[in-house]
Regions:
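Topology signature of small-to-medium multi-pass alpha-helical membrane proteins
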Residues: 1-148
Length: 148
């Protein structure tokens, strides 16, 4: 049962990571003027530009391009972490934890709290479940069902 839960969680992390990579790359190109996609992409870019410019605090100094690059980086980290966790490698859980740190960093960087905080809490809980499911073998990764 632990394995089924862990595989489900890793699949969710992998899919969300791939979405972050795709959206981050798409929006970086949109922000850089490499292409112009109408509709939601235009609205999302305008909203991000407004958000970044209106922040009193932006510790790192994100621009829309670097912000979307960071989103894509987070997607790469969580995707690789999910694959590592599925392969029962300790580094998988380490990368998933790095993703959580990156996600939390965005809230600290902009000194803001918004509904996306719930995604951070959910990801943290899911990571805790992965750790729980894999403990006991020393790897931090989920054991195969029936393995000693």
């Amino acid at each position: 049962m632990k394995r089924i839960v862990a595989v489900t969680i890793c699949t969710v992390f992998l899919l969300s990571g791939l979405i972050r990579i795709g959206v981050g790359g798409l929006m970086m190109g949109q922000a850089a003027g490499l292409w112009a996609i109408e509709g939601e992409a235009t609205e999302a870019l305008a909203e991000t530009k407004r958000f970044v410019s209106e922040r009193d605090v932006n510790i790192v100094g994100f621009t829309p391009i670097t912000y979307f690059g960071f989103i894509a980086f987070m997607g790469l980290v969580i995707s690789m972490g999910a694959v590592g966790q599925l392969r029962r490698k300790r580094w998988g859980l380490v990368l998933i934890c790095l993703y959580i740190v990156c996600h939390a960093f965005l809230f600290v960087n902009f000194m803001t709290v918004n509904p996306k905080l719930l995604f951070l809490v959910l990801a943290s809980v899911m990571t805790g479940v992965l750790w729980w499911a894999g403990r006991g073998d020393g790897s931090g990764a989920v054991k195969r069902q029936g393995a000693a």
